[in-house]
């Protein structure tokens, strides 16, 4: 018996008007993730994934390129407004926020959510160069 042709449905892209940009800036890399209000990931990009390797990964320019790539991918969902959450002490913090602003997003507020220990784990020893 011949099988009936299965119809493939075209996946409908959801439209989101406002979302959250999570910027995780470490000393070695910068990760930019753009989510909707519920926390579902719409797009993401990293400095390392944007073509920067080694010490160039931890530069503000690499963070700017990563934020631009995540922003252009998120604009396909119709994203207009962003709430920015910045975490970590890295050099790409401000440049990533500036790149999202220049990409055409209206930034509603910027929050620093860097975890600060209440005297928890012992920190790494100081570098001697």
Swiss-Prot record:
Q: Does the keyword Glycosyltransferase apply?
A: no
Q: Recite the UniProt keywords alphabetically.
A: Ribonucleoprotein, Ribosomal protein, RNA-binding, rRNA-binding
What GO CC annotations are associated with the protein? ribonucleoprotein complex; ribosome
Q: Which Pfam families match?
A: Ribosomal_S11
Subunit and partners: Part of the 30S ribosomal subunit. Interacts with proteins S7 and S18. Binds to IF-3.
Annotated family: Belongs to the universal ribosomal protein uS11 family.
* Source species: Thioalkalivibrio sulfidiphilus (strain HL-EbGR7)
For this protein, the record's HAMAP family field holds:
Ribosomal_uS11 (MF_01310)
InterPro entries in UniProt: Ribosomal_uS11, Ribosomal_uS11_bac-type, Ribosomal_uS11_CS, Ribosomal_uS11_sf
- Gene name tied to this protein: rpsK
What's its job? Answer: Located on the platform of the 30S subunit, it bridges several disparate RNA helices of the 16S rRNA. Forms part of the Shine-Dalgarno cleft in the 70S ribosome.
Which one GO biological process term can you cite for this protein? translation
Name of the protein: Small ribosomal subunit protein uS11
Instruction: Decide whether keyword rRNA-binding is in the record.
Output: yes
Q: What top-level branch of life does the organism fall under?
A: Bacteria
| One MF term in the entry's GO annotations | structural constituent of ribosome
């Amino acid at each position: 018996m011949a099988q009936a042709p299965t119809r493939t449905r075209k996946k409908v892209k959801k439209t989101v008007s406002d979302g959250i940009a999570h910027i995780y800036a470490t000393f070695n890399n910068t990760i930019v993730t753009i989510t909707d209000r519920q926390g579902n990931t719409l797009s993401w990009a990293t400095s390392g994934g944007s073509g920067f390797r080694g010490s160039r990964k931890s530069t503000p320019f690499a963070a700017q390129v990563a934020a631009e790539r995540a922003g252009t991918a998120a604009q396909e969902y119709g994203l207009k407004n962003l709430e920015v959450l910045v975490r970590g002490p890295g050099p790409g913090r401000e440049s990533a926020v500036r790149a999202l602003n220049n990409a055409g997003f209206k930034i509603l507020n910027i929050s620093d959510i860097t975890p600060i220990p209440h005297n928890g784990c012992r920190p790494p020893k100081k570098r001697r160069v």
